[in-house]
Amino acid sequence: MLLDLSKIFGKSKNSKDLAKERLKLVLIHDRANVSPQFLEMVKGEIIKVISNYMDVDEESLDIQMTRTKSEDGNSVVPALVANIPIRSVKNSGK
């Protein structure tokens, strides 16, 4: 069962958007050998931490597990790629 973060964090998506998001998660799972549930948990944790410091557009947030060449170029390793639109930075007072 996929975690539906839109219910937890507010704004609801229409059926088309949900189906598209689920398909993306399945494809990511196939490429990186991680479950869609794991990726949703990572996404939720990233949102939680970043939200302490800035207001982000959760609807446009895109996090993917991909594969890339290692630094030595001899192997392929998983990589976490995040595109996180920032609406504003919170005043931390520090």
Swiss-Prot record:
InterPro entries: MinE, MinE_sf
Coiled coil: none
GO biological process: cell division; regulation of division septum assembly
Entry keyword Cell cycle: yes
Superkingdom of origin organism: Bacteria
Function comment: Prevents the cell division inhibition by proteins MinC and MinD at internal division sites while permitting inhibition at polar sites. This ensures cell division at the proper site by restricting the formation of a division septum at the midpoint of the long axis of the cell.
UniProt protein name: Cell division topological specificity factor
